[in-house]
């Protein structure tokens, strides 16, 4: 039976989001202390413009926000990993990096063998979204659970990639680490560029809307137009 794993995709400016969230929480706290005194509703969202101005007069030192900022998480990608015995090493590597139960990286002991927090550092619009560099985060590193690189499994090289396919990124033959990519395109000519060169080991089961959001974050040069990272991951 095929194993199923997930990646929660986050997008945006985390620092700016934290600042907006802090402003909203401060507004909630301020309102809870003053609602009864001034006869105000219990939640910031219920305040009229006049009531908002009243609360601003109570606290002139802080910027108040009356609605929570939009969530950074844009959704979940759920993948079915291949059940082929000929891909067992590749699927075991990916699943373990999703759960993060293998401890620290051998070549970067301060980093975990875990996709959590990993950047999707390369997103080529209408082609691929790549991430999983657990050691450096920028595409120049990566490490498998086997301690470095591991060889291509031939069964995966025989699978023709399609939109939603999950494959190992590499820097040449037999150079798989933790880096992976998800196929964004349906175009045959672009798919042909991937065929036989990368080990395909999974397919998207759920989250096609999230795949579209990833594509929207992509540019022709591969640099995402907004920060994108894995904010949650594991087995389903």
Q: Language-model segments: what does each one mean?
A:
Residues 1-236:
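Cross-family detector of peptidyl-prolyl cis-trans isomerase
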């Amino acid at each position: 039976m095929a194993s199923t794993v997930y990646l929660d995709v986050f997008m945006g400016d985390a620092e700016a989001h934290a600042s907006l969230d802090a402003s909203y929480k401060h507004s909630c706290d301020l309102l809870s202390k003053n609602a009864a005194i001034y006869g105000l509703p219990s939640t910031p969202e219920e305040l009229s413009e006049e009531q908002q101005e009243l609360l601003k007069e109570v606290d002139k030192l802080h910027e108040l926000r009356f609605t929570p900022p939009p969530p950074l998480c844009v959704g979940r990608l759920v993948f079915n990993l291949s059940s082929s015995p000929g891909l067992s090493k590749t699927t075991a590597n990916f699943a373990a990096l999703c759960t993060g139960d293998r401890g620290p990286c051998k070549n970067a002991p301060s980093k975990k063998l875990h996709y959590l927090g990993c950047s999707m550092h390369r997103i080529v619009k209408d082609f691929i979204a790549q991430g999983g560099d657990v050691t450096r985060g920028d595409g120049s590193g990566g490490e498998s659970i086997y301690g470095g690189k591991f060889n291509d499994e031939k069964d995966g090289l025989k699978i023709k990639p399609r939109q939603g396919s999950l494959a190992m990124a590499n820097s040449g033959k037999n150079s798989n680490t933790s880096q992976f990519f998800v196929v964004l395109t349906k175009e045959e000519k672009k798919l042909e560029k991937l065929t036989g060169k990368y080990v395909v080991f999974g397919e998207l089961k759920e989250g096609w809307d999230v795949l579209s959001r990833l594509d929207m974050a992509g540019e022709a040069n591969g640099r995402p137009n907004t920060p994108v990272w894995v904010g949650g991951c594991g087995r389903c």
